[in-house]
């Protein structure tokens, strides 16, 4: 069972499981089923926030991949974030325990950890965020992990995966990063800020998550990172592939704050999530740049592919979808 099956991670996870000969059931409240086209999966509409509906959905399930989450850096969504990411996780854990699921793989995030000290490598033993005033999404992932660990003590066999930033193909909706990627490719963003982030290819993440079913230890968390990629280099690779110059100007960091009103208006007019917010700037500005992911590499065989391959395949996917000119 995959919760949030039509999302970016869920879409790639479905394909990886099918490739491994595993029967897949997906639950999703969203009726956007493009992620399932031509896939042999069992679709069950529902929501992790509807505790009662999970009884029939979990019937006969052996393994659960809990990917369903609200990924938003807009504080106006904090109640929804809490409902889905925290209480939804509690419902999934309760249903998993009740239906005697063999294994739960819970998808958390590197953002669940306390960021400080920034200069130290981010490892699995880093304390989780406790500050109630923290970014709502970050705090929700930390609290959800605490719930998973609580259920492990009750007998649930669960392992936790902390991806860094996620990118790659089969991003149908698309994700926040996917929309940014498309906007850059279409020339809708003319300037660059010299920052970056650690990104893992979603296909590598899916492979590692499947391996975690058999190799992941109960209650253990695994950081699944990729490569640090700054947006200047990303735009260079994209420019070369598309044959046109992208992100022509590099601006100082403070200009991001100047752009906040524009992105707010844009999100309201176009009725899509706001990509640039105070919290997203905070995430970029105060990040852990050293994320070795050694435990996942050693125990789960995680092997990140190159930045160039990921960008090329992501471009091809969006071009095939008709969203890049």
Say what each PLM segment does:
Residues 1-20:
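N-terminal Rossmann NAD(P)H-binding glycine-rich loop of SDR-like oxidoreductase domains
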Residues 41-87, 95:
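NAD(P)H-binding glycine-rich loop region in Rossmannoid oxidoreductase-like domains
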Residues 87-137:
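Conserved Rossmann-fold NAD(P)-dependent oxidoreductase catalytic core, especially the SDR/UDP-sugar
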Residues 91, 143, 174-176, 193-213, ...:
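Substrate-positioning beta->alpha
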Residues 133-159:
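Active-site Tyr-X1-5-Lys
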Residues 154-160, 164-198:
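NAD(P)-dependent short-chain dehydrogenase/reductase
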Residues 208-275, 293, 306-325:
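Mid/C-terminal beta-alpha module of Rossmann-like enzyme folds, strongest
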């Amino acid at each position: 069972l995959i919760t949030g099956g039509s999302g970016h991670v869920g879409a790639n996870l479905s394909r990886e499981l099918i490739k491994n000969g595993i029967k897949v059931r997906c639950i999703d409240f969203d009726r956007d089923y493009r992620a399932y086209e031509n896939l042999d999966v069992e679709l069950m509409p529902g929501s992790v926030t509807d505790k009662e509906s999970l009884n029939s959905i979990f019937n006969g399930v052996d393994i659960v991949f809990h990917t369903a989450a609200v990924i938003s850096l807009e504080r106006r969504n904090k109640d929804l974030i809490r409902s889905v990411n925290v209480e939804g996780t509690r419902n999934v854990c309760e249903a998993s325990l009740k239906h005697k699921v063999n294994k739960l793989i819970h998808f958390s995030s590197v953002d669940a950890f306390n960021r400080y000290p920034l200069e130290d490598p981010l490892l699995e033993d880093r304390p989780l965020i406790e500050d109630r005033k923290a970014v709502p999404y970050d705090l929700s992932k930390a609290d959800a992990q605490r719930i998973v660990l609580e259920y492990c003590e009750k007998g649930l066999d669960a392992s936790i995966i902390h991806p860094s930033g996620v990118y790659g193909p089969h991003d149908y909706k698309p994700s926040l990063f996917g929309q940014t990627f498309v906007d850059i490719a279409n020339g809708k963003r003319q300037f660059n800020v010299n920052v970056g982030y650690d990104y893992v290819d979603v296909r590598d993440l899916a492979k590692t998550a499947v391996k975690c079913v058999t190799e992941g230890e109960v209650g253990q968390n695994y950081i699944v990172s990729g490569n640090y990629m700054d947006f200047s280099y990303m735009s260079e690779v994209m420019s070369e592939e598309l044959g046109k110059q992208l992100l022509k100007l590099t601006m100082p960091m403070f200009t991001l704050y100047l752009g906040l009103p524009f992105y707010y208006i844009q999100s309201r007019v176009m009725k899509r999530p706001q990509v640039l917010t105070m919290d997203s700037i905070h995430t970029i500005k105060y990040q852990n740049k050293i994320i070795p992911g050694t435990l996942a590499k050693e125990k789960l065989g995680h092997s990140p592919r190159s930045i160039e391959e990921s960008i090329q395949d992501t471009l091809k996917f969006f071009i095939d979808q008709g969203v890049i000119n």
